[in-house]
Amino acid sequence: MYRTLGSIALLAGGAAAHGAVTSYNIAGKDYPGYSGFAPTGQDVIQWQWPDYNPVLSASDPKLRCNGGTGAALYAEAAPGDTITATWAQWTHSQGPILVWMYKCPGDFSSCDGSGAGWFKIDEAGFHGDGTTVFLDTETPSGWDIAKLVGGNKSWSSKIPDGLAPGNYLVRHELIALHQANNPQFYPECAQIKVTGSGTAEPAASYKAAIPGYCQQSDPNISFNINDHSLPQEYKIPGPPVFKGTASAKARAFQA
């Protein structure tokens, strides 16, 4: 169940800009994340990442976990518990926040996040309502991602109620849109063992592959934030957010 982190070389210049998740608080317990500028062989819950620089293509395999290759440890949490991720630094105030989970088919040691198994547990965009909204591009503070710039650089999400137990990856993703038509993706992954006796699992309509949940040409990915002649709208990419028991009940009612 445990794996040792491999070593990876980093350029010091990568620390000068952008950012990455470097710590977590899960179910009230603090967990250090991977520190790319510290000695190798770190026993942490987070998949190692190469640097603070973005993934620039929606089809790049690194989009899944920023090139991460596994972790030695995992956190334990129950449905309804809170996951808080903290970034060491963050400077971009326009774009969405997406938080995903993925149920591993077995042990973490063989879990690579492949296939259409990723589901969102949280998202925030312009004013954080997760729907198409009119966007005032001259007011970057209208984006919830701006809270990472002016606040403590942390974002909290809840594990879906009634989520079935098992080994999961949790993936935090920031998509910076401050450069028109040139999106920047910042994903990191960590390992969580969900406990309890829940039975809620997302249906196929809530799941997606990463990469694959979006295309580079999508209007909400290659987004011209500076073009005021266009209808100023933004819809967060990907499937709807899975809320666990509530989502399962809603689906059963619709059926």
UniProtKB/Swiss-Prot annotation:
One of the GO biological process terms = cellulose catabolic process
- GO MF: metal ion binding; monooxygenase activity
Q: Which key words are in the record?
A: Carbohydrate metabolism, Cellulose degradation, Copper, Disulfide bond, Glycoprotein, Metal-binding, Monooxygenase, Oxidoreductase, Polysaccharide degradation, Secreted, Signal
Please state where this protein is localized.
Answer: Secreted
Residue positions annotated to bind Cu(2+) are: 18, 92, 186
Signal sequence coordinates: 1-19
Residues reported to bind O2 = 178, 184
Disulfide linkages recorded for this protein, renumbered to the chain, are: 65-189, 104-111
Q: What role does it play?
A: Lytic polysaccharide monooxygenase (LPMO) that depolymerizes crystalline and amorphous polysaccharides via the oxidation of scissile alpha- or beta-(1-4)-glycosidic bonds, yielding specifically C1 oxidation product. Catalysis by LPMOs requires the reduction of the active-site copper from Cu(II) to Cu(I) by a reducing agent and H(2)O(2) or O(2) as a cosubstrate. Is active on regenerated amorphous cellulose (RAC) in the presence of ascorbic acid or 3-methylcatechol. Also acts on phosphoric acid swollen cellulose (PASC) as a substrate.
Recorded protein name is: AA9 family lytic polysaccharide monooxygenase D
What organism, scientifically named, is this protein from?
Answer: Thermothelomyces thermophilus (strain ATCC 42464 / BCRC 31852 / DSM 1799)
